[in-house]
């Protein structure tokens, strides 16, 4: 697969962050998004810029319960070589209610 893409839409599965301990799942989800985009665009992880909307969406249910997947749009700037990651679709996440 060529790594000279300019723009792409991805649904990134974040279920892998649930394997570890609960206390830093959202932070690991951000790192996973960065690593995923870097791998698919052929750039370093330092060259991936995550938009604030993506960060807020992942942290929306606190540090322990990030969403299972996130759909993002990644755009590569040909001049700087940096990739910007933006949220494309935000599904409604609601806190679960206790059932009796």
UniProtKB/Swiss-Prot annotation:
Q: Which SUPFAM superfamilies match?
A: Ribosomal protein L31e
Recorded superkingdom: Archaea
The terms describing its cellular component in GO are:
cytosolic large ribosomal subunit
- The protein's name is Large ribosomal subunit protein eL31
Give GO terms: molecular function aspect only: structural constituent of ribosome
The protein's organism comes out as: Hyperthermus butylicus (strain DSM 5456 / JCM 9403 / PLM1-5)
Task: Note one Pfam family from the annotation.
Answer: Ribosomal_L31e
Q: Which gene encodes it?
A: rpl31e
Report the sequence similarity comment from the record: Belongs to the eukaryotic ribosomal protein eL31 family.
The entry's keywords: Ribonucleoprotein, Ribosomal protein
Q: Which GO terms describe its biological process?
A: cytoplasmic translation
Look up keyword Secreted and say if it applies. no
Instruction: Show the NCBIfam families listed in the entry.
Output: PRK01192.1-1
